[in-house]
Amino acid sequence: GATLASESGKRGLRIGHLETESGSVLSGYIKDKTGNDAFYMVGGDNQDANLAGRIMPMGGTNLNVKVGLVKEGTGTYRITANNNLVTGGLRILNGAVMVNNDLEKTEQEKLTGGIGHLANNASEAGVYVMTKGILGGIGSVGTTTDVYGTVAPGDGGIGTLTIKDFTGSAQPGLTLHPKAKIRMEVTDRDHHDQLTVGGLLALDNRMEDFT
């Protein structure tokens, strides 16, 4: 598969529509050197897309390099790779991001999952769901998640979204702000969406103060 990388320095790259296939890589600075960060803003064309390739710093080992995603537009992006390292975090400004990696494989093989953790395993939130954003899916998020918008486990049906790091690092938590919503599909008492959090669940009274 192909590799999409950036030049040196701190870069912001805006791509209206981005699709990646399994075997491809969405990366940062092409030379794997600390201090060169890349943030991809995607989804501006308001269409759905799949990110099936890996998302990680060049080489996949230098956790000091940030590779981040910013989701704009009203479409839905689906992330399906099992061993991503979105070291610069994910911000969902609008539309939806479905994290749909294979949860069983991720847990059994102790992989990083659909999102992974931040550069240097930083403890602050790595996923921000803004007021107009939705986070859903049936996979795993390996970093603390801060929600001003909506968390909706599943993707077109009953499912479980897991916020947990299977690599053995400190467990991520979930922070809900005043206007945050958790949207569940319930058929009956035995068939319903679930949200699993490996770390702490926190309530924070701060309103959205940035986008």
Where are the regions that the model predicts?
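Extracellular repeat-rich scaffold modules on cell surfaces
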Residues: 1, 19-130, 140
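Extracellular beta-strand/loop-rich repeat segments of large surface/secreted proteins
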Residues: 9-11, 130-211
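Aromatic/basic micro-patches that form nucleic-acid/chromatin recognition or nuclease catalytic surfaces
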Residues: 4-6
